[in-house]
């Protein structure tokens, strides 16, 4: 699957159970990759003051030919001077410093006759961003060190601001998470861990499966996410779990429309059947563990919405399985839907 670089807003359903209800105060915030959410990595570079601004164009051309910086196209070669005295108007980025950074003269850095150093002052070391910024916050941090180009992903910016989803879409999201909360409450009534999950086809807003934690000594792997994936499979004529002792765990049979769409949008597994959850959304009250996150990768889920984080969570807290570049499927993750309510269900995960 092609990696997901941004977040596409989808229209809300025509009708949802709570369409007259004002959504509670919560935000669906994206869980981005480590590259998108981490601090800006800096490397040392050499720069030099441009003492004669009439030489700027020539120096830029000659230095760029010798040190083209193909791995750092985001770095601008010239910046306004930050010298308090104002003795010169700009600084020119020469080259990366490498592991043996130290004081260097122009003669050591700029080979002649390829570069005529007239017009340049004494070189100095400066930290510069090693990679292009991926979010606006990274851009603001990066340009504080050195001028940097930035190609903003408006969808990511909207998602980080909590503005990606319309009021109608938020109402639908709240309805589905409330359903997961009720499933978690049913689990607690059976003496099970209070974690609930719901799988939804976002194209129709149709609930395909509702499940909760069903773990026991005999079946320790039946986490809510694993249960829901199996229930979706049962709706497709597959699945293997016997959940008759848990009436809150239910599924609906795949419709002809869903089956037809599956054939057009889903790749096939080794049995020539479509992957179980391609194109579907999962709502779960607690952040999934590593096992469940990998199951979602294999099931080809499209998006995951979770309420409260987990100490060993694999979709943001401990790991970001959904965004690993070495996996053959990645998916979008949002956190914070009805977070307080979800946290109260299972206060000591």
From Swiss-Prot:
Pfam families from the UniProt entry: dCMP_cyt_deam_1
Cofactor: Zn(2+)
Residue sites binding Zn(2+) per the record: 223, 289, 292
Residues recorded with modification N-acetylmethionine: 1
Naturally occurring in which organism (per UniProt): Rattus norvegicus
SUPFAM superfamilies documented for this protein: Cytidine deaminase-like
Region Disordered, residue ranges: 1-25
UniProt keyword Aminoacyl-tRNA synthetase present: no
GO molecular function: catalytic activity; metal ion binding
Descriptive protein name: Probable inactive tRNA-specific adenosine deaminase-like protein 3
Domain CMP/dCMP-type deaminase span(s) in chain numbering: 171-334
Gene that encodes it: Adat3
InterPro entries to which the protein is assigned, alphabetical: CMP_dCMP_dom, Cytidine_deaminase-like
Keywords, in A-Z order: Acetylation, Metal-binding, tRNA processing, Zinc
Family according to the record: Belongs to the cytidine and deoxycytidylate deaminase family. ADAT3 subfamily.
CC terms in the record's Gene Ontology section: cytoplasm; nucleus
The keyword Acetylation is annotated on this UniProt entry: yes
GO biological process terms on file: tRNA processing
